[in-house]
Amino acid sequence: MIIMKEAIIATHNPGKVKEFKEILEPRGYDVKSLAEIGFTEEIEETGHTFEENAIMKAEAVAKAVNKMVIADDSGLSIDNLGGRPGVYSARYAGEQKDDQANIEKVLSELKGIEKEQRTARFRCALAVSIPGEETKTVEGHVEGYIAEEPRGEYGFGYDPIFIVKDKDKTMAELTSDEKNKISHRADALKKLSKLLEA
């Protein structure tokens, strides 16, 4: 019998939970979302970096549930916009966290800008908090550029407008398997797996 290690993922975002499960479960983790453990408290994301926000979430939930917690803060950084939307990615177009409105705002701000000036990256900071241990962090990223219009049916967030470098596909045009090999979250999770196994 294989013993699974429980990992609580500090998010209410079903898209993120799905990615975590697809990447961590084959590595022997029993992944549970906040909803699955009945944690409904909203955690303020007041950090100035992805890493600060991930640490805040991981430590707050770990303290409440007394279990290992993995938290992620991730987003899109666009060079031509000075790194925006950055830590404000989820609420770029307003507090309602509307993916479509966020996409429309980015496309509007980049209207008429040439492809070479639309470079961007998805960044993901992961923090793992284990009661009684120091919180550890890793960061992953994937390079690309912003499309002129949304393409694809998969994924969530900015996936329909983020074209992966060296591919002619947006993240939303990639299958889960394809995305999980190259995404910023996959990159960070691979680093986190090595850290947890050390």
Swiss-Prot record:
Q: What name does this protein carry?
A: dITP/XTP pyrophosphatase
Residues annotated for Mg(2+) binding in this entry:
E44, D73
The record's GO molecular-function terms, alphabetically, read: dITP diphosphatase activity; ITP diphosphatase activity; metal ion binding; nucleoside triphosphate diphosphatase activity; nucleotide binding; ribonucleoside triphosphate phosphatase activity; XTP diphosphatase activity
The annotation note on the cofactor reads:
Binds 1 Mg(2+) ion per subunit.
Entry-linked Pfam families? Ham1p_like (PF01725)
Per the UniProt record, the source organism is: Bacillus subtilis (strain 168)
The task this protein performs is described as: Pyrophosphatase that catalyzes the hydrolysis of nucleoside triphosphates to their monophosphate derivatives, with a high preference for the non-canonical purine nucleotides XTP (xanthosine triphosphate), dITP (deoxyinosine triphosphate) and ITP. Seems to function as a house-cleaning enzyme that removes non-canonical purine nucleotides from the nucleotide pool, thus preventing their incorporation into DNA/RNA and avoiding chromosomal lesions.
Q: Which residues does the entry assign to the active site, renumbered to this chain?
A: D73 (proton acceptor)
Task: Tell me which domain of life the UniProt entry assigns to the organism this sequence originates from.
Answer: Bacteria
Cofactors: Mg(2+)
Q: How does it assemble?
A: Homodimer.
Q: Which residues bind substrate?
A: T11, H12, N13, P14, G15, K16, S74, F156, G157, Y158, D159, K179, H184, R185
Family matches, as NCBIfam families: PRK14822.1, RdgB/HAM1 family non-canonical purine NTP pyrophosphatase
Which biological process terms from the Gene Ontology are attached to this UniProt entry? Answer: nucleoside triphosphate catabolic process; nucleotide metabolic process; purine nucleoside triphosphate catabolic process
**Which key words tag this protein in UniProt?**
Hydrolase, Magnesium, Metal-binding, Nucleotide metabolism, Nucleotide-binding
GO CC, one annotated term: cytoplasm
